Each structure stands twice: as structure tokens, then as C-alpha cells.
Amino acid sequence: MPLFGKSQKSPVELVKSLKEAINALEAGDRKVEKAQEDVSKNLVSIKNMLYGSSDAEPPADYVVAQLSQELYNSNLLLLLIQNLHRIDFEGKKHVALIFNNVLRRQIGTRSPTVEYICTKPEILFTLMAGYEDAHPEIALNSGTMLRECARYEALAKIMLHSDEFFKFFRYVEVSTFDIASDAFSTFKELLTRHKLLCAEFLDANYDKFFSQHYQRLLNSENYVTRRQSLKLLGELLLDRHNFTVMTRYISEPENLKLMMNMLKEKSRNIQFEAFHVFKVFVANPNKPKPILDILLRNQTKLVDFLTNFHTDRSEDEQFNDEKAYLIKQIKELKPLPEA
């Protein structure tokens, strides 16, 4: 009895057939419709081989192993991603399902697909370029695959330390809301998933990240961008792994001035997120003189402002405790003794 049944192709045959169909689709000759149909059929067959189907047994481990190996040997993962814009709507979803399935595959403690992608970083860079304006129809599928990749520290490290990462500052501000939001989800995942890796990255790239790029997001004309960026900034500064970065950020007078201005924004949501960053400046027991001087100059105004700040949040115990603490700290501020 044939191992894969008469009508079912083996992993080797499936991968070969899909690669030929993708190449035909890429060539764009007169047989495009046929190539599109072949790509779709083969993607469904590979998806079913990985996930099983309603009328078939779950796939055996050795079948999945053979299929994965063929995907590596044929360089098909990169080829699929490079041609994602040419594949039909359902096919794009199947590519993401196939990619994420083989990515999660483990042999003991090893993740063979992660190891493979480490040797082919172009896969990651091509996925990141999925947020570019040229092909908006692939952005969300690219994002799904990128966030799955970001779960693995080795892959997140390649992405963070690439020039391509800094393009996210542009992607999160694109005019299409769904794409900008998806890009921000991936951006946030890369900056928060692996704490030590992220802390080292932010520390090593502090000026480029905060002064050259992040400041622009905080001053964006787009409300959603400003709010999301402000919220993420609060999370980054309050994460204990980012202590060095936080200390540096709250020592810079321009950052304090920006947060004080954002406390007075029209949007209550932005005011609230700004409060969570502002409190870090005030709570710092070792305030540099320029920071202390700004707080002292505005001492009375700040006490009055905070006393009347979001008074309707009466049931938010943590917020009210923090607000009371800040008011007390600001009231008790004194100039540094003369040297």
C-alpha cells in the first residue's frame, strides 16, 4: 500500500509542485490563472498535511518532519513570502498558517525552523517589508508571521539589530488604520517580549531610538499613534529590566516638559497615559538639578493641577494613591543645597 495513498502527493512531490507553480506565477506568463490555481491547491494540501483535515487522520510526525525539511531544502518559505502579493486571498492565509506551524515545530528543545531562519535572515527582512505601501494587501498576513517569529529570541534579535527595524517608525504611521495598528502590535512585541534583549538594545541605541525616532511618535499628529506610543513608553520605563534606560530618560528636561504638556492635552486618555510617565520623573529620589528646577518653578501650579486631575476616577484606588503620593512629593520639594 502506498505510504501517502494513490491520490495524495508525498511531501517531496507537494513542495516540488508548489515551487513550480510559484515560479510560473512569478514569471507572469500566459498560464497565470493555471499557476494561481495550482498554487492554491498545493497550499491547501500542505496545510492539511500539517494540520490534518476533517476527513483525515492527524499527520504523523515523520510526515511533518519530511515536509519541513523539503521546505528548507527548496528555499520555498522565502519564495512564498516574496510572492505573497501574487497569491490569492485564501492562499495568503494558508501561507501564514503553514509558516507559523513549521516555525513552532520542535525536536526536543530544538526549533529547527528557527535555526533555519537564522541562516536565512532575508525571510525576516522580506516579512518586515510587508508593511511597505507597495502591497498593502499582504501587511496583515506578514504581521501574523512576524509576531510568531518575534516569540523566538534568536529571531527577535536579528530583527531588532537590523536597519529594517527602524522602518517601523514609519510603518506605525501609515494612513491605513488596520496596517498601522498591526505594525504597532509587531513593534511592541519586538520591544517587550524578551526583556534582557530589549533592555540591551534600548541601552545601546538610546539616542537613535528615543531622540531621533520615538520623540516623533510622541509628537505625531495622529491621535492613535500618540496614545499608543505614550502607553508603550510608560511600559518600557516601568519595566525593571530597563532601569538604565529609564534613569537616562527621566534625567532629560525636554522629556519632562513634553510630559507636562501632554498632561494638559484635550484627550483624557492621553492625559492619563502621560500621568504614568510623569510620575516616574517625580518619584525619582535622585533628580538631577535641571529636572528639580522645572518641578520647583511649577510647584504650586502642579499641586493645584494634580489635585483636580481626573477626580472622577474615584474607584481607581491605585491611581488615587499614586496621585496623592505625587502631590505629597511635589509639595515637599526643596532646592538642592548650594555647593
Swiss-Prot record:
Gene Ontology biological process terms, A to Z: intracellular signal transduction; positive regulation of TORC1 signaling
Pfam families in UniProt: Mo25
Protein name: Protein Mo25
Protein species of origin: Drosophila melanogaster (Fruit fly)
Source superkingdom: Eukaryota
Entry's Gene Ontology molecular function annotations: protein serine/threonine kinase activator activity
One GO cellular component term: nucleus
Family: Belongs to the Mo25 family.
